[in-house]
Amino acid sequence: ESSLPKKVLIAKPFYYSYPPMIKYSGMETVYLKTEEGQIDLDDLRKKIIDCRAIIINSPSNPTGRVESINTLKEIESLANQYGVFVISDEVYKDLIYIQKNYSIAGPHVITINSFSKTYGMCGLRVGYLWSLDNTLIKDIIQMKTHTSMNTNILGQAMAMKATKTPRSFIREQLKVWQDRRNLLYNGLKKIDPDLWNPEGAFYMLPKIEKSAEFVWDMYRKYDVISYMGAWFGAPGRVRFSYALDKKKIEEGLFRINEYLNSRHL
């Protein structure tokens, strides 16, 4: 049993399930400052010494930002120094456009990954993790066994097939994702000139006035689905996904502009 406080560090904006999962684990969430969606290292150094674990999500859902390799190495070093667990959520790691992948490693690191994003298997919910801590892995297997039980057979079969997919296929898909990103980014930048350009994953998080009203109006009146940034710890922003073909992205941008223009009539 760790003697460290029952606190878990996450960066804002965050994936919206992190705070509830931390709460249901009997822990307290501590929030890290970010600069343009990337971790503030000075704030990290101050707060990590008072936490039991830190969750890293790079590339990020909801921002698409990627932490620099230097930042990831600093987290790796600090975690090792203070005995803090690192939960590295790397489900978008194959969807990085701007640098080589770097995976945090060490005795206190738990790496989480998924077949959902890389192979387009989102609905099948097949994931995996690894760690050097065998005791921890055994505890996780017990928890999995007595909560969600077995992973569906179809998903397992597809996952095994996916492991035989050439890496060249994954690299080729990056061009498709970049084209979609560029299309959405150029459209949304007209709404938010300071919009962060995603370096990975497939999300954007622009500032939009009356964001809650925007999300519900777009859904009810224009059949466009987006998520409120407030759900991710980013009030005043809206999360969009570009996991769509380019024609749908173009149509979505047209409807967004149509709605925003109607606001000013």
List the model feature ranges, each with a label.
Residues 1-7, 211:
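Phosphate-binding glycine-rich loop
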Residues 36-97:
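Active-site phosphate-binding strand-loop segment of PLP-dependent enzymes
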Residues 25, 81-82, 191, 222, ...:
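Helix C-cap/helix->beta junction micro-motif
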Residues 1, 10-27:
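Substrate-binding/gating loop at the entrance of the active-site cleft, primarily
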Residues 6, 27, 81-85, 107:
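A short helix->loop->beta-strand "cap" motif at the edges of active sites that frequently abuts
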Residues 42-45, 210, 217-226, 232-265:
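PLP-dependent enzyme catalytic core of the Aspartate aminotransferase-like
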Residues 110-178, 182-185, 254, 259-260:
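Conserved core segment of the aminotransferase class I/II
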Residues 160, 176-185, 195-208, 236:
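Conserved glycine-rich beta-strand-loop-beta hairpin in the small C-terminal domain of fold type I
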